[in-house]
Design a protein with these regions (language model features):
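Glycine-rich adenosine-cofactor-binding loop
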Residues: 1-14, 141-143
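N-terminal Rossmann-fold cofactor-binding loop
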Residues: 23-28, 166
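Rossmann-like adenosine-cofactor binding region
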Residues: 27-96
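Adenosine-phosphate binding glycine-rich loop
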Residues: 75-135
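Conserved lysine of the Walker
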Residues: 147
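Hydrophobic positions on the alpha1 helix immediately C-terminal to the Walker A/P-loop
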Residues: 150
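Short beta-strand-centered segment that lines the nucleotide-binding/catalytic pocket of NTP-utilizing
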Residues: 160-169
Length: 169
């Protein structure tokens, strides 16, 4: 993408010495000629492609076409594991979503609006809390094996609602 998130990612990567190529729908570097950049070491998705509710969409269909790829950063944070991140995981490529960046941006915005400093340690604390809230535990097993019992206990321990398929159906 070539919007604001892309500009931020580009600035940070270039500050760390990266040679950045920005792809967008139009221009000489676009989604139709991704193969020209098969030597990419890092892919950053700075588009809403893959964001809820269009979770099946992916900005790149075949990550294997990038044999030098060392990491994928998807700035989408909902869902926590987008289609492109799942593809990266399947290939053993380190990957991360944009939730931590969102929290860091919120911290900076809050400081700007309030004029009060906020300790950087709050970023990790809030990120961890949000990540836990976004994750689910799914229990799968044969009838009578204890899924409901274990699920009920986990729901109490984690202070989370229990969605029992037997009760829902």
């Amino acid at each position: 993408g070539s919007g604001g998130a892309s500009s931020t990612a580009t600035a940070v990567l270039e500050a760390h010495g990266a040679n950045v190529v920005v792809l967008s729908r139009t221009g000489k570097d676009n989604y139709q000629n991704l193969n020209r950049h098969s030597d990419a070491a890092l892919i950053v998705n700075a588009t809403p492609v893959g964001m809820y509710p269009n979770v099946e969409a992916s900005p790149i269909e075949d990550l294997a076409a990038f044999p030098m790829l060392e990491g994928v950063l998807d700035l989408v944070y909902n869902p926590a594991r987008t289609s492109i991140l799942l593809k990266a995981e399947a290939l053993g490529i380190p990957c991360v979503n944009g939730l931590r960046m969102l929290v860091a941006q919120a911290k900076e915005s809050a400081e700007w609006f309030t004029g009060e400093p906020i300790d950087d340690s709050c970023i990790e604390m809030i990120y961890s809390r949000l990540r836990r809230q976004m994750e689910n535990i799914i229990l799968i097993g044969m009838p009578g094996c204890g899924k409901t019992t274990v699920g009920t206990s986990l729901a109490k321990i984690l202070s989370r609602p229990l969605k029992d398929a037997d009760a829902e159906l």
